Structures are given as C-alpha cells and as structure tokens.
C-alpha cells in the first residue's frame, strides 16, 4: 500500500495548532502524525526533525506576512500603511506567540535550522525597519507626533499588536479598534 501524501498547508496548519495547544517541548511527530492520519515516517520524508519542521512553519508564516506587508506599499500615506500593517500583524497574531519558542530551538541541529533562524531574525529586523521608516515618514507628513522618538512609537505600536483579543472580535474590527485607540488616544473627543 502506498504511503499517504501530506498536503503542505495541512501540515503547516496542524503544526501551528499543535504548537499553540501543546507548546514546543510537547510537540512531536507522533502526535502530529496522529492528527494528520499518516505514519510518522511520512512526516520524516518531508522533514528530518521537529526543529526543521517548526522553523519551516515559521518561514512559511513570515513569507505570508511579508508578502501582505509588501502589497501595502501602494497605499498613499504612511499613516494608512501603518494602519494596514497593524491589520496584517493582528491577522497573524499567533506568530508572536510561536516566535517566543525560537530560543528553545537548537539552532545547531542542522544547517537548515540555522539558516531558517537566521532568516527569521533578518525578516523580523526588516519589518521593524519598515515600521520605523513609516513612523519617520508619518512624522514628516505631519500625520503623527514628532515630539516622541520613533523607537518609542514603534515599541508602543508592537505592544498594541500583542493585546489579547479576549472578546474574539473579527481580526479586522479588532485591528481597527486598536489602531484607533493608539492613534486617537483614550481622551474623549474635544478633551485633548
């Protein structure tokens, strides 16, 4: 009997669910194989270790985030880009939780893992530089305050993305609300 193939997106989706539910330390191929209804050896045909699979998953998500962020460069104002970027980051909010496991991964387990972790670090730095650049452009355009350092604004921006959506709002509505509070503040209209 031929081995069952695994669809890439199914493998990535189940990997994500297991990481979110069980954490990195409890993640293993047997559990993943059971969820995918395949033999463990089938997963080994694709990835030689959990480190390689998990970093491949992270690269896959980062590629999607980066592609969506790059598509926003066409927006006319830096403020609109910052708002739209927040929507992308909130849409993929699970990535922040999952990237917290990077220090647990043995980066020296294989050249592929080391390369993936290095790339993730570079991509994260690129996104941070993009946000910082947009902050500077928005200041120049008079869209945001220029009396606060961009590094502080960027930290507040990234912290706002991490606010848990306990009410389980649609990610678009949640992003809109968070950005509005971030941009307009908590003061009642006319009280600023």
Predicted regions mapped to residue ranges:
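Short hydrophobic/aromatic patch on the recognition helix
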Residues: 37-47
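Short amphipathic alpha-helical segment with a characteristic S/N-K-E followed by hydrophobic residues
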Residues: 26, 49-55, 64-65
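Amphipathic, non-transmembrane alpha-helical scaffold segments
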Residues: 54, 58, 62, 117-128
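Basic, helix-initiating cap at the start of DNA-binding domains
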Residues: 1-22, 26-35, 52
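Amphipathic alpha-helical segments used for helix-helix packing
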Residues: 92-115
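C-terminal peripheral helix-coil segments that are non-catalytic and often amphipathic
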Residues: 91, 129, 133-141, 156-192
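Hydrophobic alpha-helical connector segments
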Residues: 56, 70-95
């Amino acid at each position: 009997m031929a081995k069952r193939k695994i669809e890439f997106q199914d493998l990535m989706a189940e990997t994500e669910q297991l990481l979110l539910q069980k954490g990195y330390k409890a993640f293993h191929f047997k559990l993943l194989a059971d969820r995918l209804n395949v033999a463990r050896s089938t997963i080994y045909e694709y990835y030689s270790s959990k480190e390689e699979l998990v970093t491949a998953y992270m690269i896959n998500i980062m590629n999607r985030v980066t592609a969506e962020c790059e598509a926003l460069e066409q927006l006319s104002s830096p403020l609109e880009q910052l708002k739209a970027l927040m929507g992308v980051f909130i849409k993929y909010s699970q990535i922040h939780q999952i990237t917290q496991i990077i220090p647990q991964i043995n980066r020296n387990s294989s050249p592929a893992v080391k390369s993936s972790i290095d790339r993730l670090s570079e991509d994260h730095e690129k996104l941070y530089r993009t946000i910082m650049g947009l902050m500077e452009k928005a200041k120049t355009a008079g869209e945001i305050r220029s009396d606060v350092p961009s590094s502080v604004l960027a930290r507040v921006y990234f912290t706002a993305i991490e606010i848990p959506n306990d009410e389980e709002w649609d990610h678009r509505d949640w992003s809109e609300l968070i950005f509005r509070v971030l941009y307009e503040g908590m003061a009642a209209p006319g009280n600023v």
